[in-house]
Amino acid sequence: MNQTWRAHLQCKLQQLHEQGQYRDLHVTEKAEETWLIRDKKRMLNLASNNYLGLAGDERLKEAAIACTKRYGTGATASRLVVGNHLLYEEVERSICDWKGTERALIVNSGYTANIGAISSLASRHDIVFSDKLNHASIVDGIILSGAEHKRYRHNDLDHLEKLLKMASPEKRKLIVTDTVFSMDGDTAYLRDLVQLKEKYGAIIIVDEAHASGIYGIGGAGLSHIEKNLSQKIDIHMGTFSKALGCYGAYLTGDEIYIEYLQNMMRSFIFTTALPPSTLGAVQKAIEIVKEDNERRENLIANGEYFRTKLRDAGFDIGNSSTHIVPIVVGSNEHALRFSKRLQEAGIAAIAIRPPTVPVHSSRIRFAVTSQHTIADLKWAIDRIIHIAKEEELFV
């Protein structure tokens, strides 16, 4: 190996170790279940994004198997070549019916959806206004676009309006936000954001990755909680990999936006399409979440119970109002130690560190699901409190 490169990489890895930011992989089994096996130890799963428990649902498995048997294991090409299977058309129609939009485009992941859409729509002639806690894929899309990047303080709409007022009138404006923030569990003020985008002549993209399948009518997303709000949002992005228990993502909105992305989005054009098995499972998952209110209600109730108990115990859970509940501890060292103790106690809960979250805000990110019982959550809470007191860290 080239010795110059070896020395450089070894130095960088050593720095990660010293900063408490080194990451490694752990073998995990049964992650689709409430109790998983990690490094051969049974643990309560409080770390996955299988929010509605659909990743292990027999109906999705059967749909995936049926499509594999009928259509094979691969798409064989990109969608613009010969990979645009009839299943794509069917699922995209289902998304439009679900979201109340004109057209949809299925892509391979939430990450590729965001980097592709933002970098295709925006250019050096434009300004993108982005919440400071938006997902990395949004940030990367803005960087790729070459647009002027204005980050407003998290959920601070006065700051956003100030930036909009200061923006050059010659530049097109794009506002982009998560709806449920993935590391904090709080939500965007969508109604106010829409009012600002209309007032200042911008368009808005919302990332519903952690809200699709959970909130709004039929689980269509946070943008569907308020009447007539969703139609005022220009582009909706959502994933199939979280509440829907599958893989992939979608972009949906007015015809003109989706037609443009189909023709200009490099992360869509230059990649092989998703396999038929995934599309079959996604179609079944959409059918289920539109009708199964009980799963959504269980998830929301579990999130409320877990948040309340942790907050009452004295933990800093920020402004979480959803199924994602962080305990913010500050340093990498504290987060890693807490995570290690939790896993030793049988709780799968992972330390989240910079650059995923801001410096000095390392945390344990818990994610409850609809499949957890109150007994599961009480068992976990008791251990979380006990370990925190024992370590003299937080309570």
Swiss-Prot record:
One of its GO terms (molecular function) is 8-amino-7-oxononanoate synthase activity. This is Putative 8-amino-7-oxononanoate synthase. The keyword Metal-binding does not apply. Catalyzes the decarboxylative condensation of pimeloyl-[acyl-carrier protein] and L-alanine to produce 8-amino-7-oxononanoate (AON), [acyl-carrier protein], and carbon dioxide. Substrate binds at R23, H135, T356. Signal peptide: none annotated. It catalyses: 6-carboxyhexanoyl-[ACP] + L-alanine + H(+) = (8S)-8-amino-7-oxononanoate + holo-[ACP] + CO2. Its EC number is 2.3.1.47. Homodimer. The modification N6-(pyridoxal phosphate)lysine is found at K242. Belongs to the class-II pyridoxal-phosphate-dependent aminotransferase family. BioF subfamily. One of its GO terms (biological process) is biotin biosynthetic process. InterPro entries: Aminotrans_II_pyridoxalP_BS, Aminotransferase_I/II_large, AON_synthase_class-II, AONS_Archaea/Proteobacteria, PyrdxlP-dep_Trfase, PyrdxlP-dep_Trfase_major, PyrdxlP-dep_Trfase_small. Pfam families: Aminotran_1_2. The keyword Transferase applies. Pyridoxal 5'-phosphate binds at G110, Y111, S182, D207, E208, A209, H210, T239, F240, S241, K242. PANTHER family: 8-AMINO-7-OXONONANOATE SYNTHASE, CLASS II AMINOTRANSFERASE/8-AMINO-7-OXONONANOATE SYNTHASE. Its cofactor is pyridoxal 5'-phosphate. It is an enzyme of class 2 (transferase). It comes from the Bacteria. It comes from Bacillus cereus (strain ATCC 14579 / DSM 31 / CCUG 7414 / JCM 2152 / NBRC 15305 / NCIMB 9373 / NCTC 2599 / NRRL B-3711). Keywords: Biotin biosynthesis, Pyridoxal phosphate, Transferase. Pathway: Cofactor biosynthesis; biotin biosynthesis. NCBIfam families: bioF. The gene is bioF. The lineage of its organism: Bacteria, Bacillati, Bacillota, Bacilli, Bacillales.
